[in-house]
Amino acid sequence: MNIYITNENHRLTDVIVGNSFSFKSNINFRDLYDPISLFYYLRGKFPNKYKLQNQISNFKKVLIKYGVKIHDLDIINTNQIFARDLGFIIENKFFISSILPDRENEIKGLKSVLKKIKNVIKLPKDAHIEGGDVVLDDDNIFIGYYGRKDYKNQITARTNKKA
């Protein structure tokens, strides 16, 4: 697979899409580390596996309609449905994110996709970053990060300055 991205506003040709086949709708709230998930759980609106599967299927249909090639994540035993956090591309390099320890297992979902890419870079363990915190705009790379000393205590701060 040839990859090359310098600007996220360019036409989308390929995309990695997650799935919800192993999604657990009946989850204990203590297993939720993400405040948004907890917010919806406490209001009785935590996502339903089958509704998510339908939404992802419809999303794929729209992408295909516009000629976008879809690469699916491997099915692993997590509540992972989005691929954006797992990595990002700068030019022809795929960077594997160094994500929260509670989510490290999600990286396994990229296994089949990564086999098709030549230039894969795994960041050091102490350089925490998620793909959603990186935005490319031609010659500029924007990275949102949390720089305070209490970083280790923040579960919503997922990118640090070292990244």
Where do the PLM segments sit?
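The feature marks the mature, well-folded catalytic cores of soluble enzymes
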Residues: 1-163
